[in-house]
Amino acid sequence: MSQYFDMNRRRFLKTSAAAGALVMGTYFMGAASRVLAGVLAQPANDTRQANLFVALRPDGVVEVTCHRSEMGQQIRTAIAQIVADEMEADWNMVKVIQGKGDPKYGDQNTDGSRSIRYNMQRLREMGASVRYMMQHAAAARWGVAPDTCSAVQHKVTHTSGKTLSYKELVADALTFTPPVSEEIPLKDKSEWRYINTGMAHIDLHDIVTGKATFAADVRTPSALVAVILRPPVVGGTIKNVDSAAAKAIKGVVDVVEIPAPKGALQFQPKGGVAVIANNTWAAWQGRKALKVEWNDGANGSYNSDAFKQQLLDTVNSPQSHVREKGDALARLNNADDKLMADYYVPHLAQAPMEPPCATALFSNGAVEIWAATQNPQADMATVAAMLGIEQDKVTVNVTLLGGGFGRKSKPDFSAEAAY
């Protein structure tokens, strides 16, 4: 039975404020099966793959793979809608499986509002190919022409009135190889059942009842938690660390110096001092107890006021015109009423409610990662290069994301978990 507790606004804000830091989990023993239940669904053992995005189970359940990251935009729901519509699946028989990082899916970087624009056509084709397989399996069973059979809501019906459910056709359907996608007719828009229809968020119930798993929820009995004290200036390096007080805190296991990045900073791990502990609270307290002297580096002389003035000077200096039509300045100068206002904002802080978070498991020369990532393939490549192993030795599981805003498309926090 689920347990509920009161969380008033004040307590929520106070608790949330404490989470404003990278939280990582790293563990060295155990197995993936020991991760707590609730991680986004994985394929059933008896599932058979129909194509890249669709798998069929003997009980008639259809598993649709979502290869993009869910961060509140309902992409897991949308992808399932598209596939299920074209294959004429009963929505109640559809289960969404979260795809791991894998080049076979093509681009998995979930940013730029591109998921549907770039994938809708092939998702429709994948669904239609399964509908084709079901229709042809039924036709073969009955010894009739496929064009006398139609698929509607998880069953195939013949013009004579005979019907077979998808469950009854799974084994036979998987023996058919559909033609190239261009030869399989797609539904007309007027026939859409789920596409362009408001559907309930498939993860909504789990989210509001606390059952949903985000990256910080991933745990194993042997997991440790790490938080990092960053240099006060980007690109800064460690001059000296006094970790005695931190190590004296109950629950703190170790203190590790993370080297500053080499070359262009971009989205490399930024370095700092990591406190590794048995629990998050001990890690936070250990970080507070650290005494660190820093070298500010080349950015130590950066002045935000001077940078602001540089931007203003750039605006007021002659620039190339992207588009010019009429004499805008003359019209403004001759206007009877003028309203002028200046607006300035500092560099954007991409600060999702859930901080970047990843867990890494090392076993037999390979690493498995659970991360709130928008770009699992970037995590794979970065971690593999950092550890000096082949990319196929890195498995990246994508959890639900508590917001992303593009920040979590960068692999630095997964790399730090695996460091």
What positions do the PLM features span?
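Structural alpha/beta core scaffold segments of enzyme domains
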Residues: 2-419
